[in-house]
UniProtKB/Swiss-Prot annotation:
NCBIfam families: SAM_YgiQ
Known cofactor(s): [4Fe-4S] cluster
Amino acid composition bias (Basic residues), ranges on this chain: 600-609, 632-645
Binding site for [4Fe-4S] cluster: C309, C313, C316
Keyword field: 4Fe-4S, Iron, Iron-sulfur, Metal-binding, S-adenosyl-L-methionine
Organism of origin: Clostridium botulinum (strain ATCC 19397 / Type A)
Cofactor info, note text: Binds 1 [4Fe-4S] cluster. The cluster is coordinated with 3 cysteines and an exchangeable S-adenosyl-L-methionine.
Protein name: UPF0313 protein CLB_0243
Region: Disordered, residue numbers: 598-645
Domain of life: Bacteria
Amino acid sequence: MSNIDFLPISKEDLKKRNIDVLDFIIVTGDAYVDHPSFGTAIIGRVLEREGFTVGIIAQPNWNNIEDFKKLGKPKYGFLVNSGNIDSMVNHYTASKKKRHDDFYSPGGKSGYRPDRAVIVYCNKIKEAFKDSPIIIGGIEASLRRFAHYDYWDNSVRRSILEDSSADLLIYGMGEKPIVQVSNLLRYGMKIDSIKNVRGTTYIEKDISSLKDYIEIPSFEEVSTNKKSYAEAYKIQYYEQDSIRGKTLVQKHKERYVVQNPPQPPLSQEEMDEVYALPYARTYHPMYEAEGGIPAIKEVKFSITSHRGCYGSCSFCALTFHQGRVIQNRSQDSILKEANMMTNMKDFKGYIHDVGGPTANFRHRACKVQEKHGTCKNKQCVFPKACKNLIVDHKEYLSLLRKIRKIPNVKKVFIRSGIRFDYLMYDKNDEFFKELCEHHISGQLKVAPEHISDKVLNLMGKPTRNVYDSFVKKYYDINKKIHKNQFLVPYLMSSHPGSDLKAAIELAQYIKKMGYTPEQVQDFYPTPGSLSTTMYYTGINPLTEEKVYIPKDQKEKRMQRALLQFSIHDNYDLVKEALIKAHREDLIGNGPDCLIPYNKPYKKSHKKNNAKNNNNHYNKNNNYNKNKDISKKNKKNSLSKHKKRK
């Protein structure tokens, strides 16, 4: 364990630090991991740097009010988050089945946090300390700050500020706003008077004094009229910029949810300061007996080089959380962290990742953003690269080269998503070549998501021909460097716009790939994304065009089965789908057929016979030659959800 002290979690810790009353208490749905990949750790350490005392209540028993009283009543208030992932996404699959594991909990076991954790925790805190201010933040609060469609309820819910009775919501990355809010509280301002901090959302009864704002359709309108919902989302989508974004107001009965414009992005110096704070860089020792916290394994020897993403994938809500503007750390800051890792006793020579939401977006998309902000009606890389886009991997490549030269570093991997279209726009192949030569371990994971151009257009992804060109170039480079490395594509079924015809088109593409992909995921309608708005309304809010939505559970199962057509258990669904789509030409023994005429006999196999677990039956399928790909790529669905680019 680290020599750095963890933040206090008990009265005994308070005594050791001679603290009578904490300034703030963070209540979180994750186990306590003091690592900069965890929001609780960052906010706690930032407040500590500002001279505040901070305690942590991690995963309290929501059925026991005493758990919320264990550190006493804080001087300034409680800070509440659900953890690194929305609690509903953490608990349920895309088909609404309960998950049985939780990589952010002791021993990887589920059951340590409630559904809708932010709401539950806030209600319990109000019960324990009626007049104590509550500030909510993190992904769950950020993406639910307005009235929003909730997939699990299949209805439009109010702003989480209304349901939680919290006093203030900090959205996005919270370092700047939490410092401003905490200092205002220290200076004596009441929580209900803090209304002018950027990056915050609050509830107001009277907006007559508010200036320069846009009022979006009310909760009552968006919960009963899908066109109004799409209109509200479009305005929200366009105004999430710190330079040109306006204050947004949404009425909820007799009150108003008010979102101040976003905070300016952190400067490089500010980013360096945040990641240089004294983190223990591991989980609290209280979890050791339970097997630790599995989530630390992915991040312990990974380096966050930047935040933000201008890829604007429709199914990703990052625009609403980290924003489109890249905020990067200096090379010196990153190299210091890499050197520090090599001195950790369990470092084996491998740095698992140097990246961010999209690894090869290391700098701002263009110079225009610095003065005017992000473009309101245009995207940086979709449908094609903007003429102002700066396409350059030189700085990122120089950083990777420097890390490779650090003593005791054997290998530096890139596991964050690589945006392959941006890679293809670069006329200089130097980065692409060194990526293949030094930074992948036998396979590169990329996210084409689909190959039907009509679906890709709705996803905000590049066209199929861009991906095909990338695939060819990838294998050409591997041939030149005498390596036989694979590509592992992330694929998605049932996204808005995907009908059976599109799913079959994707299945035919998979057939030509020669193996059955493991990285397949049903579209998951999570709060805050453009695709979720399409899913709920049947409308593309940016174009106002109608969109086909595969909501029927049988069809969704068919679409997923088509993506793994060679698995024995999927035979009946695939056959039914092909017949329904009048594609009987794909049933038979021909080279282009997906399945044979008759369902093959399923042989019994021993449970430990890993070679035959999937029961692949297609003689024309080359999957078995590449079975090592799928075996190496079995990851939990939460990590898949996070890393799709």
